[in-house]
Amino acid sequence: MCWNYQVSLIFSVIYVVTNSYYVVKRPLYWKQYLLFGSFYLTMEVFQTLQWLFGNVYSDSMYGQSVCNSINVNYTIVAFILIWLQPILFSVIGYQTTTTNKWFFRVLTVLNCFVFFYGLKLLYGGFEKPDYYTISDSMFGSSTCTNEGETGHLVWRFKPKTLDVFPNHLTYIILCIISFVMYENNATRVIGLGWLLSLIVTKLLLAPTLVEIASSWCLLSIIANLLIVAYVHISTGIYLTGQ
């Protein structure tokens, strides 16, 4: 999910390697680690395909006023992948909790509502005439993808209304709510890796705000290798104690 299809493809390979490690090693919660890794592998492969076949436009402050259908369809898939992530994390929480089943059940329902409501608003935007746009934001003149200032993909959306359309802050809050409610270190390492990836990506790669949603290439290194390191260390401690 970085600068070009070659980079996205390389990070896809890293996901394949780490996912294979989870399957072979089978630590506690290996299915959740595999679910996490497989989802972001899907995102990396998707962005590889988008760079290759998605007809991505060049940099634009307000996005494209007219967007070809192939680009539009790729951008809709990007929206779906973005908003499946909070659902992913609440489902992982539900699968691994022993005391907060009710909480994660409610949170999953909330995340599903945000997902489907946002999708409804997105499709409603195709029938709405042009309205005001915000420069360098996720809201564009059309639902379309272009290359950003620092070379990352920029996914812009034209919803039916801007006022209640889920945004970056909504996304981060919903993800973090799941992380803070995880019950043990074996699952908290997923949230820690995700948060560290976000921080390091912003500091090291310095994507603009509008590019941040697609700038998750370091997640394959930071989050997955953090999980692998945790599994390796915790397994070693367990064996030592036998």
Curated annotation (Swiss-Prot):
It comes from the Viruses. The keyword rRNA processing does not apply. Glycans are attached at residues 73, 185. The chain crosses the membrane at residues 4-24, 34-54, 74-94, 106-126, 162-182, 189-209, 217-237. Its main location: membrane. It is a multi-pass membrane protein. It is found in: Membrane. One of its GO terms (cellular component) is membrane. The keyword Membrane applies. Keywords: Glycoprotein, Membrane, Transmembrane, Transmembrane helix. This is Uncharacterized protein R287. It comes from Acanthamoeba polyphaga mimivirus.
